[in-house]
Amino acid sequence: MPLLDSFRVDHTRMDAPAVRVAKSMSTPKGDDITVFDLRFCVPNEEILSEKGIHTLEHLFAGFMRDHLNSNNVEIIDISPMGCRTGFYMSLIGTPSEETVAASWKAAMEDVLKVKAKSDIPELNEYQCGTYEMHSLEEAQEIAKMILDRDVKVNSNEELYLSEEFLKEHS
């Protein structure tokens, strides 16, 4: 099985919260696609709560689009990581990590402004696969944590795991 790019970075040295370009590619028609690692928690030390990350998934996707989409950028998808330490965001365009960080913080401010569970989008059995597994309070605690800690940038070069290192530690 091929080694995916996300497993070529040292998770023991990642800052969090932090933005990292996880992958960049161009389509055959020339569109630039960028995948960002939006790391909310320090890997292997912290984890986002089940209900909090789920509610955040519903809120974050819309709020990030409000702040980041433009004539040059269009978000394709924002999805939680299986390890529950952050989200992956795929988009058309090449915004800087600093632009993404600013949009992320603005989106977290928006999460804090949500007044009630009834304001969470798509929160019903028809549009959500686990519609009862939500907590606005936990999502807002996560948003506050991001804003309190501020968002940094993780460098691929600094986190890169060499073939030799991987062979020694596998």
UniProtKB/Swiss-Prot annotation:
EC numbers on record: 4.4.1.21
GO BP terms: namely: quorum sensing
Annotated cofactor note: Binds 1 Fe cation per subunit.
Name any cofactors this protein relies on: Fe cation
Can you tell me which residues bind Fe cation?
54, 58, 128
* Superkingdom of source: Bacteria
List, alphabetically, the InterPro entries matched. LuxS_sf, Metalloenz_LuxS/M16, S-ribosylhomocysteinase
**For this protein, what reaction is catalysed?**
S-(5-deoxy-D-ribos-5-yl)-L-homocysteine = (S)-4,5-dihydroxypentane-2,3-dione + L-homocysteine
UniProt keywords (A-Z) are:
Autoinducer synthesis, Iron, Lyase, Metal-binding, Quorum sensing
One annotated GO molecular function: S-ribosylhomocysteine lyase activity
Enzyme class (EC, first level): lyase
Pfam families in the record, alphabetically?
A: LuxS
**Similarity field:** Belongs to the LuxS family.
The subunit field of the Swiss-Prot or TrEMBL record says: Homodimer.
Q: What does this protein do?
A: Involved in the synthesis of autoinducer 2 (AI-2) which is secreted by bacteria and is used to communicate both the cell density and the metabolic potential of the environment. The regulation of gene expression in response to changes in cell density is called quorum sensing. Catalyzes the transformation of S-ribosylhomocysteine (RHC) to homocysteine (HC) and 4,5-dihydroxy-2,3-pentadione (DPD).
Q: What is this protein called?
A: S-ribosylhomocysteine lyase
Q: Which organism is it from?
A: Marinomonas sp. (strain MWYL1)
